[in-house]
């Protein structure tokens, strides 16, 4: 992984740690600072791995508070990760309205990932794609609505991710 954590990512990580320690006011204050500086909405309740990368300082990124994002995932600018008109899935008897995104995923600029779907490890989401169905591990999803056009081999997936 060539990229390093940028300022918006650092602010989010501190906000998340404060949130987990039940220090809600400072956590929300940092969320607001990110919103003002980078026009992004990344709530501290979102379970985003500390090693996830926000491209271009998270400019215009909007993420649902129930979202899970795995390690080393790259989320480019203008991405929306959110709910889909009240649709949900059950996980441990709890309603989940937002996407679950695996590790080492690449989400291209302007992509929209909507609803209680699962994006598998090493998946690639094309720029501008509107994803409302699950994407398998190592799947490549593009288009509006997005379709999985290919499932990469292990070698292809690792090679593609290493170029980010």
Language-model features, listed with the residues they occupy:
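Terminal amphipathic alpha-helical/low-complexity segments used for targeting or macromolecular assembly
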Residues: 1-39, 146-149, 153-164
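Left-handed beta-helix
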Residues: 38, 43-44, 49-50, 55-56, ...
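Conserved catalytic-core motifs of eukaryotic protein kinase domains, centered on the activation segment
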Residues: 85-86, 117, 152-153
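Regulatory activation segment
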Residues: 89-97
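Glycine-rich, phosphate-binding/catalytic loops in enzymes
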Residues: 92, 123, 141, 158-159
